[in-house]
Amino acid sequence: MNIGMVGTGSIAHTMAKEFARLTTMPVVAVYSRSADTGVAMANEFHIPKVYTEYDEMLADPEVELVYIATPNSLHFEQAKAALLAGKHVLCEKPIVPTVAQLDELLSLAEERRLHLLEAITTIDHPNYGLAKLFAKEIGSIKTVSCTFCQYSSRYDAFMNGQTPPVFDPAYCGGALM
């Protein structure tokens, strides 16, 4: 399955490194509003096509799955457009800010028999391996409660009076908003 990447920020770079390890899922296109950042990412990760118009990338028959790594406020419209174009969608978290938007995307995906996934990696987190290891010692597990948190330098900016997008409701904030 061929991947078209949407966005060229830090998380997109992290994922591009991971996608490069997949032999059966090459990244064949990248979309960026800026031709310069799109070309830079394409050169860094050997991505053959760069688009500065999202609809043009969606019209590319070679793109089968769209990976969305843009500000959260863009996720709904970009995911919806991809589904309407017949593409599978892998979207960074939070996928959308409201249940109504999620329901709409899920309905579209189901109607078109497409996959809609949120990119969350906690299933591969080392803590799950520890839980499995300790299960042998403590016996059958009935319930597990986990808390996952990570310090963000953007919190420092927020505490200094700035409003990074992750704390800005206009951008649908971060995963906690």
Language model features with spans:
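Residues at the C-terminal ends
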Residues: 21, 84-86, 111
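N-terminal Rossmann-like dinucleotide-binding module
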Residues: 1-45
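Rossmann-fold dehydrogenase core element
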Residues: 104-121, 140-144
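Beta-loop-alpha module in the N-terminal Rossmann-like domain of NAD(P)-dependent dehydrogenases
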Residues: 45-106
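Short active-site oxyanion
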Residues: 2, 25-29, 64-66, 116, ...
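Predominantly a Rossmann-like dinucleotide-binding segment in NAD(P)-dependent oxidoreductases
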Residues: 122-177
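Alpha-helical elements of Rossmann-like donor-binding domains used by nucleotide-donor carbohydrate transfer enzymes
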Residues: 14, 40, 56, 65, ...
